[in-house]
């Protein structure tokens, strides 16, 4: 939503992986940057219909993935939880739901195929920090960094070729 743009930007720029400064400097700088960038960002969001499509699309992707996993792997129940890095739902918002589900193992899968300390690295770190803060210990692995995975490339190639044929 438009009213969430500035707090989203603040969360983004207050991340030590984005601005590697002591908190005493990073916090006011994040406030300044988010305040100055918010008007331009709000105009962009207005052009997108008033909000970012990312959460809606991520929910759809999550639901489709859970259905496919549960159809393919019938010996276990799979559930996908969405955690956003700079806006809701944050790791702190989701951990109770994960604990209630009580998985034997958690597989973290950032939607960024490439590794970057400021994106996938920061997201993984936040999840681990929240687990530690909540004294939550469960086997956790990460699917990270798959930009050259052949299946990933094939899926993108297939969609690109479809678009080219539509031109």
Model segments located where?
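Active-site-proximal alpha-helix that buttresses catalytic centers in soluble enzyme cores
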Residues: 1-167
């Amino acid at each position: 939503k438009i009213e969430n743009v500035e707090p989203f930007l603040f969360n983004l720029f207050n991340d030590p992986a984005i601005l590697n400064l002591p908190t005493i400097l990073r916090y006011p700088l994040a406030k300044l940057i988010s305040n100055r960038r918010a008007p331009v960002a709000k105009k962009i969001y207005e052009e997108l219909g008033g909000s970012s499509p990312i959460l809606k699309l991520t929910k759809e992707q999550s639901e489709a993935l859970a259905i496919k996993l549960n159809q393919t792997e019938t010996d276990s129940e799979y559930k996908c939880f969405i955690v956003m890095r700079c806006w809701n739902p944050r790791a702190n918002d989701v951990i109770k739901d994960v604990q209630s589900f009580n998985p034997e193992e958690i597989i973290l899968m950032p939607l960024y195929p490439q590794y970057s300390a400021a994106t996938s690295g920061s997201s993984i770190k936040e999840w681990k920090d929240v687990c530690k803060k909540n004294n939550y210990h469960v086997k956790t692995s990460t699917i990270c960094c798959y930009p050259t995975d052949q299946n990933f490339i094939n899926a993108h190639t297939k969609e690109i070729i479809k678009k080219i044929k539509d031109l």
